[in-house]
Structures are given as structure tokens and as C-alpha cells.
């Protein structure tokens, strides 16, 4: 049996169980909030499966703009600011409904399931399978204790399930992340940039990222600009990259891959930029900004991404790794990253560095430090500093800093206000 067939079989087994969850009764009245939680997450996972089928059947290409908007909204509506105060992804809500002991852990589990949106659009079936299986395993542990002993499972037993998930799949994730970083073979975003009909804004929904007014307005605005202006923007960006190598005496001809980072809506500029990089002998590596705990998500995004649908949601979960962070976890991460870089060491030497399109003009954000959100202990913070230093040292063994360069160019986003178009044109002139 082929790997894909095996994965589909495992997926269907997990889904069979997940489909039953909304209709199941819990005997203990005191545990009804847990039924609500598992039902909410199960319904989200069934929407993920519906989206997978939608994509497999090619409906992404035939659906109307309104249909694509509705699906995108359905996938993200639970964490939008107007709904977040009632969402189990919100640690404050999870703690209030599910208790102080389990609340943050439950919010983390749902957040990890939400990382499936991007994986679904990329067709990464293995990522779907392992998370659906994880959710099913956690649910089974709760149901067993509720039915047999009329109580919750121990916190330690559930944390252990989640701990072994992040540990067991650390090697797979490390290899995938290094491959994404240094091997130009992942063409998901590059294909959208190169092949999409950019005047048809339906293309924005092919990523699986949240599409809001910023992305739509940016794409529309870039579509309104003359070709000459787009060329100027892209050429300034790519020439800045090439000149970075030239002025520092680094040999660009030895390099094969450029790490392209941008926000959705800039595709018309990025198409010209990729053509320019092609002429330099560079193929793009373009990866999604991480959402899963296995890929080290951050409020500071690298890769391709959209304006956050809810920055408070991201802030609430920025330290979720503290649920697992210990010396053994750090050692495991370091070990699997070393193995992954060793596997792709030739490709790593061809990594030329990042070419970044940054944005400015987002509305001010004053994060709320919620007591219910996961926090690092002082010991964990120290451990994390050491771990990051070791990871950086490891990466520098394979991606030689003295042989790479970078470029950064910045543009305003529509959220900046009525002055957006004027400010954008002035930014082009200054660049």
C-alpha cells in the first residue's frame, strides 16, 4: 500500500471517531463544558476535512469570490476579535469554562488544531493525520475517565500525550522546516505568484491564510499601478539584494536559493521579483509563517503571511511551548535539527539569505497580559535563551554567515488610513 493510501486510511479512522463526538452524551453534569469544548473542536476539524475535499475536487478554481470569502471566514471566525471572547482558543475562556488546571492546555490543543488550515491548503496530508489522531487520543482519554470513573483524567496523563506528540514528531518537523528553508522544491507559494490570474482576486484565497480588507485592498491597488511602477518596486528590491553581495565582496554565483518573505497582496510585485531572481540564478524558497508548535510559531513572522486576524490571539499563545519546555525537549530539538541540516548540508551552502518585504501602518496594538495564558518560568526563560543560542550556532555551521546577505524593503498597508495611496507612492520614490 502506498504512503498516501495509508495516510488516507489513518485519516478516515480518526475522522470516524471525530464525527461521533458532537452527538455523544456525557453523564457527569459537572463535565458538560468539556463536551462543549470537544464538540467545538470536532466541528472545526470536520470543517478542515470538508475544506480538504473541496480542494481535492478542484472547487477552489471554480468557486465564486463570495463562496471563497465565506469559507475563509468560516475557518477563521472563531478567533476574530468579535468572537474571541467566547472561543476555547482564548486561554481566559478555556480556564473559566474548563478550570485552571486544564484550561491553558485545552486552549493550546485547539490552537494546534487550527494550524491545520495552512497544511490543508498545501495538501500536507501527514500533518492532518497526526493532529487528528492526537485530538482523538486526548478525547478518548477524557471519555474513558468520564464513563468509567466519573471524573477527569489526571493533568499529567494529558500533558504526557501532548509532550510525546511534540517530541515524537520533532524529527519529521525539523526535516520539513530545513527542507523548506534551503531547498527550492517547495513551489506552493511560488506557483501562486507565477501562475495565478492576479486580476482575479480569488487567487488570494488559494493560500489558506486569513484574507481581510488589507490583503484585498493591497492586491487591488497593485493591480491599478502601471507596469513600469511595479517593475521599479521589484527591481529596487532585487537589486538591493544583488548589490548586498557585491559591496561585501560575497560571491552570489555560488548560491542557488533566495529566501523570499512577503505579505499577501504583493503578488504582482513578487512575480517580477521572482523573474529577476531567476536571471541571477536564484530559485525562491517560500514557506508559510509557522502556526504549529512543531514549527516554532512566533508573533514575529517569517515567510508568507497575512495581516493577523487577531494579534491578541497570537500574543496569548506566544509562550505555549512552556507547556513542554525542559532540558530533554531542548536536547531533542537540537538533535533533530542537526540531523536535518546534515541531510541538506549541500543545499544549505547554496542558501543566499532572506529577501524581505516588510510592511508598516498597522493599527496600534496594546496586548493584554492574561494571567490564564501560558507563561515561562525563570528557569525556562534561561533554558530558552541557551537553546536559541545553540540553535543559532548549529545553523551557522551549515549556513555560513560570511557567505550570505539579505535585503529589506518596506511599504505601507491600507490599514494606515486615507493617506495609504499617497504614502505608498512616496515610499516607492524614497526607495
Regions found by a protein language model. Name each.
Residues 2-431:
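Active-site bordering "gate/hinge" segments
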Amino acid at each position: 500500500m502506498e504512503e498516501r493510501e495509508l495516510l488516507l486510511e489513518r485519516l478516515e479512522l480518526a475522522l470516524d471517531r471525530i464525527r461521533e463526538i458532537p452527538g455523544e452524551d456525557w453523564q457527569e453534569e459537572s463535565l458538560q463544558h468539556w463536551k462543549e469544548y470537544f464538540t467545538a473542536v470536532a466541528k472545526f476539524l470536520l470543517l478542515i476535512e470538508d475544506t480538504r475535499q473541496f480542494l481535492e475536487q478542484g472547487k477552489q478554481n471554480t468557486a465564486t469570490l463570495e463562496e471563497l470569502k465565506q469559507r475563509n471566514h468560516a475557518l477563521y471566525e472563531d478567533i476574530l476579535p468579535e468572537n474571541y471572547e467566547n472561543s476555547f482558543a482564548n486561554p481566559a475562556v478555556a480556564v473559566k469554562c474548563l478550570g485552571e488546571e486544564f484550561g491553558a492546555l485545552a486552549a493550546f490543543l485547539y490552537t494546534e488544531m487550527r494550524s491545520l488550515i495552512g497544511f490543508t491548503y498545501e495538501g500536507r496530508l501527514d500533518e492532518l493525520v497526526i493532529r487528528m489522531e492526537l485530538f482523538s487520543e486526548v478525547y478518548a482519554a477524557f471519555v474513558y475517565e468520564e464513563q468509567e470513573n466519573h471524573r477527569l483524567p489526571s493533568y499529567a496523563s494529558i500533558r504526557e500525550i501532548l509532550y510525546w506528540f511534540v517530541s515524537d514528531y520533532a524529527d519529521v518537523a525539523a526535516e520539513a522546516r530545513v527542507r523548506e528553508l534551503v531547498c527550492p522544491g517547495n513551489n506552493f507559494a511560488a506557483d501562486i505568484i507565477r501562475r495565478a490570474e492576479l486580476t482575479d482576486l480569488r487567487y488570494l484565497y488559494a493560500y489558506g491564510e486569513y484574507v481581510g480588507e488589507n490583503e484585498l485592498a493591497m492586491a487591488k491597488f497593485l493591480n491599478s499601478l502601471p507596469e513600469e511602477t511595479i517593475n521599479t518596486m521589484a527591481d529596487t528590491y532585487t537589486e538591493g539584494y544583488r548589490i548586498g553581495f557585491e559591496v561585501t565582496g560575497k560571491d552570489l554565483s555560488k548560491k542557488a536559493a533566495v529566501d523570499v518573505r512577503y505579505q499577501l497582496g504583493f503578488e504582482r510585485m513578487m512575480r517580477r521579483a521572482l523573474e529577476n531572481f531567476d536571471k541571477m540564478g536564484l530559485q525562491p524558497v517560500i514557506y508559510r509563517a509557522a502556526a504549529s508548535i512543531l514549527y516554532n510559531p512566533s508573533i514575529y513572522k517569517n515567510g508568507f503571511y497575512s495581516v493577523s486576524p487577531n494579534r491578541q490571539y497570537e500574543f496569548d499563545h506566544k509562550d505555549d511551548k512552556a507547556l513542554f519546555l525542559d532540558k530533554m525537549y531542548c536536547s531533542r530539538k537540537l538533535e533533530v535539527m542537526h540531523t536535518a541540516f546534515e541531510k541538506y548540508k549541500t543545499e544549505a551552502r547554496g542558501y543566499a539569505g532572506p529577501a524581505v518585504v516588510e510592511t508598516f501602518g498597522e493599527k496600534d496594538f496594546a496586548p493584554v497580559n492574561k494571567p490564564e495564558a501560558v507563561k515561562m518560568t525563570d528557569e525556562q526563560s534561561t533554558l530558552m535563551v541557551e537553546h536559541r543560542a545553540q540553535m543559532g550556532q548549529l545553523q551557522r555551521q551549515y549556513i555560513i554567515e560570511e557567505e550570505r546577505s539579505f535585503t529589506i524593503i518596506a511599504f505601507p498597508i491600507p490599514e494606515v488610513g486615507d493617506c495609504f495611496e499617497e504614502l505608498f507612492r512616496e515610499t516607492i520614490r524614497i526607495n
